[in-house]
Swiss-Prot record:
Substrate binds at residues 27-31, 77, 154, 209, 327. It is found in: Cytoplasm. Its EC number is 4.1.1.37. The record marks 77 as: Transition state stabilizer. One of its GO terms (biological process) is protoporphyrinogen IX biosynthetic process from glutamate. SUPFAM superfamilies: UROD/MetE-like. The gene is hemE. This is Uroporphyrinogen decarboxylase. One of its GO terms (molecular function) is uroporphyrinogen decarboxylase activity.
Length: 354
């Protein structure tokens, strides 16, 4: 593997000194870029794009050709794991992801097998190794998975949900069934993420997109507990250096202290959290990633630059901050505004790293 030329993202996650605050964007390879739309059209549909390792590599690299980003993130989807379990993932226009065979009974859960990441998910591993090779050491490659709770919401509900009624019913009426599902998912994610590291991922992120839908006690029981299990099972060293792990629970600002106790290296923050407050609460234990509202990228460029400055000042001096959005970039954002955002982070953050 080529020597890493820009490692400030990895260094910041480990709270080592950096020259400027590193920056990348969730969903940086996505529909706001015209070149992404062209490649997706070439693939035919979203999952065909994910399953073609050469095209997945191409869209991963596209934002790095445009912008001075400090990390690349594997182009894939969190639902690859349940798809590999045989649920029959498909996408309906305007409806989002759906499953032909939801896992909404204990009998269905018992029948689930843990997928082999080098077999059923081999296309993801081929994408990881291809991207790592093509990056040629330019920036680190982030691998990722959904959290067990978040994956389970889609599996039990049969797709996206606004109320999570079915899975919450299972949580409170049949908790043993849900724990069985979450346990299988945690085991699957451990294998999946470790295989990503073996194929070249240099950092890992666990996306708990729907943890914020849970009550205080239910979050610990049904979400955090299983992310803890994953972290305990991960490969934490590769290529002679630590593989940092970031946990991101959208809507999880209440639980930062508990999340920081898991042994992760960093916490992702959504835009509802004050980053200065987050640093006071957990900055002695973990690095922080975030956390500009993605909708701010619709603002005039001077307003974007102002908000970048506000968040940098909120975090303050020293390392341990990776700048990002508080969630994925929206599809209708002007690519020039995204570029201005990235430039502003690098330009304005120098003063905080002396």
């Amino acid at each position: 593997m080529a020597e890493l030329k820009n490692d400030r993202y990895l260094r910041a996650l480990l709270k080592e000194p950096v020259d400027v605050t590193p920056v990348w964007m969730m969903r940086q390879a996505g529909r706001y870029l015209p070149e992404y739309k062209a490649t997706r059209a070439q693939a035919g549909d979203f999952m065909s794009l994910c399953k073609n390792h050469e095209l997945a590599c191409e869209v991963t690299l596209q934002p790095l050709r445009r912008y001075d980003l400090d990390a690349a993130i594997l182009f894939s989807d969190i639902l690859t794991v349940p798809d590999a379990m045989g649920l029959g993932l498909y996408f309906e226009a305007g409806e989002g992801p759906r499953f032909e065979r939801p896992t909404d009974t204990i009998d269905a859960i018992k029948k689930l097998s843990i997928p082999d990441p080098e077999d059923e998910l081999g296309y993801v591993m081929k994408a990881v190794s291809t991207i790592r090779r093509e990056l040629n050491g330019a920036v680190p490659l982030i691998g990722f998975s959904g959290s067990p709770w978040t994956l389970a919401t889609y599996m039990v509900e049969g797709g996206s949900s606004k109320t999570f009624e079915k899975i919450k019913k299972m949580a409170y009426a049949e908790p043993m069934a849900l724990h069985m599902l979450l346990d299988k998912l945690a085991d699957s994610v451990i294998l999946y993420l470790n295989a990503q590291v073996a194929n070249g991922a240099q950092s890992l992120m666990i996306f708990d997109s729907w943890g914020g839908a849970l009550s205080h006690s239910a979050y610990r029981e049904f979400s955090l507990r299983y992310m803890q299990k994953i972290i305990d099972g991960l490969t934490r060293f590769a290529d002679g250096r630590k593989v940092p792990v970031t946990l991101f629970t959208k809507g999880g600002g209440l639980w930062l202290e508990a999340m920081a106790e898991t042994g992760c290296d960093a916490l992702g923050l959504d835009w509802t959290v004050d980053i200065a407050d987050a640093r006071r609460r957990v900055g002695h234990k973990v690095a922080l990633q975030g956390n500009m509202d993605p909708s701010m990228l619709y603002a005039p460029i001077p307003r974007i630059e102002e908000e970048v400055g506000h968040i940098l000042a909120g975090y303050g001096e020293g390392t341990g901050h990776v700048f990002n959005l508080g969630h994925g970039i929206h599809q209708h954002v002007d690519p020039e505004h995204a570029g201005a955002f990235i430039k502003a982070v690098h330009a304005q953050s120098k003063r905080y790293h002396k």
